[in-house]
Amino acid sequence: MRRILSAVAIVAVTAGIAACGSSSSSSPGSGSGSAAAASCSNSGIQPELFQKGQLTVATDKPVYPPWFENNNPANGQGYESAVASAIAKQLGFKPSQVKWAYEPFNASYAPGPKKFDFDINEISYTPQRATAVTFSSSYYDVQQALVALKNGPISAKHTPADLKAYIYGDQVGTTSLAFITSEIQPTAQPKVFQTLNDVKSALQTHQIDALVTDTPTAQYISSSEIPGTEMVAQFPSTGEHYGLLLAKGNPLVTCVNKAIATLKSDGTLQQLQKKYLQTYLSVPTIQP
C-alpha cells in the first residue's frame, strides 16, 4: 500500500541491483563493505547479521492475506512470508534459523539502528525513505486500487475527473495516501488514520467514500473482509514497487539482491505470485 516512484528513481534502483561483489555505489539497493566483498553463503554473511546464527525478519502485526496467512508470518504461507522464506533459503538458513520480529510499519523506515536484518511489509521504495534506510531490489511491482461501497456513486462514475469529487481516507505514512494526494488530487483533503483497520471502519461507517491500497489487498478487503464493498478498479502502474527494508548502509543488501535476482531468474517469484496473488489481479484499470 505504499508509494509512487519516479522514472529517475527507477533508473537508480535498477543501477543498484548488483551481484554479490564489492560496490562503491550509494544508489538504492546497492551494497558495500565486508558482505559485498565476502561470500553470500550463510557463513560469509554472519558478521552482518543482527544476531549471529539467525536471520531476523521483521513485519507489522496483525498481518493479512494474501501477503500472510492465519496471522502467522513464520508459516511460509502468503506471498511475503513465502518470499522471505525463499530468500532465507538462498542465504543458507534453515527454517529453524529464521526468527520473526515485530516492527510497526511507520517505525520501519525511521532513521536509526534496526533490530532486524530485513523488514518485509509491503513497503514501497521512495527516495525520501531511502535517505534513512536501504532498500533491496523489487520483489513485487505495485498498482494501487480503489475500494468503495457497492452501488455507490463511485461504482458508476470513476473517470479521473469524477474521482476528484469524492472523500478518501488512508493510513498515515503510506504511499496509498500519497497516491490520493498526488495522482487523484481530490477537491477535499483525504482523511488520515493511524491503521488500515481504522480506514476500513471509516469506509463501513460512511465517513469516507473510498480507500486506496495495493490491488491484492484491495481485492481481499472487498471480497473477504468488508461485506457490501467492491474493488472498483485499479490505477495504471506508476513504477511503484515493494522492496525489503534494511538499516541504512547495511551491506547485507548485496546478498539479498543476489537472492532476489535468483528467485526472479529461476521463476520462483512468478510461481509465488501465481499461487498467492493471481486471483486478485484480474481487474479493470482506470484509464487516464
Across the structure, where does each feature detected by a protein language model lie?
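Extended ligand-binding regions for polar small-molecule ligands
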Residues: 21, 81, 90, 152, ...
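Extracytoplasmic small-molecule ligand-binding "clamshell" domains
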Residues: 37-119
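Short helix-initiation/N-cap motifs at beta->coil->alpha
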Residues: 98-110, 154-155, 191-205, 240
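Bacterial lipoprotein signal-peptidase II cleavage site
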Residues: 19-32
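Acidic, polar ligand-binding/catalytic clefts
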Residues: 85, 96-160
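A ligand-binding cleft/hinge motif common to bilobed small-molecule-binding domains
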Residues: 107, 123-132, 181-182, 204-205, ...
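Periplasmic-binding protein-like
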Residues: 61, 141-148, 215-261, 279-288
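Ligand-binding clefts/hinges and TM-proximal coupling segments of bilobed small-molecule sensing domains
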Residues: 22, 36, 40, 44-47, ...
